[in-house]
Amino acid sequence: MASETITIHTKQDIIDYVNERKTTKRTSLLLIIVLGTIFLDAYDLTILGTATDQLTQEFKLSPTYLSFIMTAMPFGALFGAAIGGFYADKLGRKLILSVSLISLIIGAIGAALSPAPAILLCFRLLMGFAIGMDSPVAFTFIAEISNKKDKGRNVNYWQVVWYIAVVSSALIVILLYSLGTGAWLWRYSVALGAVFATIILVLRLFYLSESPSWSMKNKTLTEASKELEKNYNINVNIEPNKGEDESFSKTEVKNPLRTLFNKRYCKRTILATSIATLQGMQYYAIGLYIPLIAIYIIGENKIESLSGTALINIAGIIGGLTGALLTTKYGARKLTIAGFSIVGTAMIIIGLFYGHTYTWLIALMVAFFLFGHSGGPGTQGKAIAALSYPTILRGKGTGFVESVSRFGSMFGTFIFPIILANLGLNKTMLLLALVPIVGLIITTYIKWEPVGKDVEHEDQYIEKV
């Protein structure tokens, strides 16, 4: 049953309604369904991180081959993000959000059944492509269904969901391990990702409609109003001003890449891309391999190392929630600066004192790393991208940032186990501490704050066809 009735006269009324409407249970439900992508992203990426020992043993993998398998998803995501962002602006948000999940389900099932490492590698590439296609569109959709005040906070909830997925993956592996799954442990774990993806796909097909902002730009007033009705469960009376419905004409950005780097958007694009890429480097090097780091800190007992992984990652949930709740008050940029500072400090302390101090102190520093990362750059890079561009450019902008950021993910995922095997934990941490230091310098220098800004009325800066 519809909760309220509104009257729409122009397309601008649609945007005004979205920007001014308080967050309701219906909006929260849509957010949870869309953020399901982030759960899948984190789960599918980290689940193999809990089973690197099994993969190495079953397939006789070298550290380099293991790195290739672990890097396959970020590599696939690089291309998926570019394509997903482009076609989300062209064909709509909902279609891409559905196609990507179907691809992810196929990839997860194939990966779980892989008889050889090369086949596993191929299906992980497909999974990465699907996640890459979905993620920027998910951030875009969240920004477009949230009111102006809550946009930054709602987009930043993704990091909370991410760490819930990471903790869940560790607990699921513990459960499956306790059930005696043996050598099939990693296969069952990966297959569960397909089950989760299927559930989210069904929820999206049932509850999700097209983004009202995209509809406003690409459909008639009547059609856009219908999408508004479906998303917010309201009744819309359409009383168009003269010529409003007939004035519809679909427009596209003439040269998206050039537009992203024009005088208006260049600093925004550089800032968002830099933060997203550098946070990917530091997280996928350290956070993704926490089960491996836990072996260094705690020992080789499977249950103990996984329990330690779950416990340490709770710091990520707390940090992500803190960052999301503080975004409106302090802005994305300031929280990013604070986060890079915390991450760099934690990595330097681990690098200097691992092996020379108490084990609990090193574990605390890893948790400190996750808290700073999830509340700062881990959260804010995606938010800055989603909030810095108007609807006509948002999909391409978030797609570009997400695509480039995957280079950072690939670097961290591929290089960490190799450096760790050759240099040990101390030198590896000190070397990788350069990443948050560079991020701190860039974020301090580029002074763009998107939180609370109205970017929808910037058509004069965008060349269209």
Question: Where are the regions a protein language model picked out?
Answer:
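Transmembrane-helix signature of 12-pass secondary carriers
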Residues: 2-465
